[in-house]
Amino acid sequence: YAILRVNNGQYEFDKNYLYDLKDYAVKGGDLAWLGDGKAYIRPYVIDVANKKIVANLAEMTGGDPTTTINLIQDGNLYTAVKTPAAKWFIYEYNIKNNTVKKGAEIDPGVTQVYHINKLK
């Protein structure tokens, strides 16, 4: 996996920008723009401009983030995480503070979470 850039108003890749992620254990290629110069490519939060990993959600949660389409709402990324004990939880990652918080537990019969919709 790699991140390429297309500058505003352009139609071709910026030849001066390439962030090669070959040395990281990127899973599945799930990608989301988080705002504030950050992107999520499972399980990493990346500072795109500085080509730097700022968070590894697998390490921060102790599990495997598995949601294919995550929810980004009110400065947070919400993702489903499967723990080594095969329990599922929704985790909230605060983009600005670089912190995670464990939320609701998901029914143990669930085998995959593909999409998280707006939370109330």
Where are these regions (language model features)?
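Short, flexible beta-strand-to-coil junctions
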Residues: 43-44, 48, 80-85
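Outer membrane beta-barrel transmembrane domains
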Residues: 56, 65-67, 78
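Blade-level signature of beta-propeller repeat domains, shared across WD40, Kelch, NHL, RCC1
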Residues: 82-87, 96-120
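Acidic, serine/threonine- and glycine-rich low-complexity intrinsically disordered segments
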Residues: 1-43
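Beta-propeller blade signature
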Residues: 1-10, 45-52, 90-97
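Conserved beta-propeller blade signature
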Residues: 39-40, 76-80
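Repeated scaffold domains used in trafficking and secretory/extracellular systems
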Residues: 20-36, 62-73, 108-120
